[in-house]
């Protein structure tokens, strides 16, 4: 939702074939895959983290379509409908089929930091997997096109807030979504995508965790609260 809408806006006035280079931070594999659909190869990109100064005859800079003013993460609530529709129309045909389960638990334990990690991960996992039939998926282990299929195939998705929820773009209408995040976190992008795609979205906000207790994560979700929300939702 960060880079692709800007490219779409730019292409409305400047055909992609006429653009020589894309100047952006180092690309993750899923970003390279998404750009390949638009015929933008890795050789066309310049790593802005490595090359801090560049010179060009013509430079095109695009402001994100959801941004108006203030803190960028708070602005995602203004995500335009056309962005989601364009992403669906462009990328859903490339979904890569694999043996994916309908009940998806987004697993962030492979993350390098403790932001939006469950302190009681094992307790939550045991309940969701053993008693409700969820299956864990680490999105870093999937290709971009497999992520598209995973989300489009799912009936219910549960997880702590993360950039992985951007893939709600590809969900079918009425897919159930349970997102857990700290009460102080203002990013409402998942809710906005759910509104546009007509998803059945539920947010669980957790109390702030003391700084000296965040070494294992900044989310503590009491099991009884999870059980209550799951039973009322499924």
Question: Can you describe what each PLM-predicted range is?
Answer:
Residues 1-234:
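The feature primarily captures lumenal catalytic ectodomains
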């Amino acid at each position: 939702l960060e880079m692709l809408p800007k490219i779409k806006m730019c292409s409305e006035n400047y055909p992609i074939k006429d653009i020589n280079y894309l100047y952006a931070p180092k690309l993750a594999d899923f970003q390279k895959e998404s750009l390949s659909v638009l015929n933008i190869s890795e050789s066309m990109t310049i790593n802005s983290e490595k090359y801090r100064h560049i010179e060009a005859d013509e430079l095109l800079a695009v402001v994100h379509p959801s941004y108006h003013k203030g803190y960028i993460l708070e602005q995602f609530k203004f995500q335009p409908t056309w962005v989601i529709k364009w992403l669906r129309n462009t990328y859903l045909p490339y979904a890569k089929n694999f043996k994916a389960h309908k009940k998806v638990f987004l697993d962030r334990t492979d993350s390098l930091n403790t932001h939006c990690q469950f302190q009681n991960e094992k307790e939550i996992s045991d309940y969701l997997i053993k008693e409700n039939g969820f299956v864990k998926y680490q999105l870093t282990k999937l290709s971009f096109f497999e992520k598209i299929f995973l989300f489009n195939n799912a009936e219910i998705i549960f997880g702590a807030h993360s950039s992985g929820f951007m893939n709600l773009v590809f969900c079918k209408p009425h897919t159930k979504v349970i997102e857990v995040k700290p009460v102080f976190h203002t990013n409402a992008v998942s809710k906005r995508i759910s509104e546009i795609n007509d998803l059945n979205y539920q947010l669980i906000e957790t109390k702030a965790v003391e700084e000296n207790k965040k070494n294992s994560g900044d989310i503590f979700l009491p099991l009884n609260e999870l059980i209550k929300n799951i039973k009322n939702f499924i």
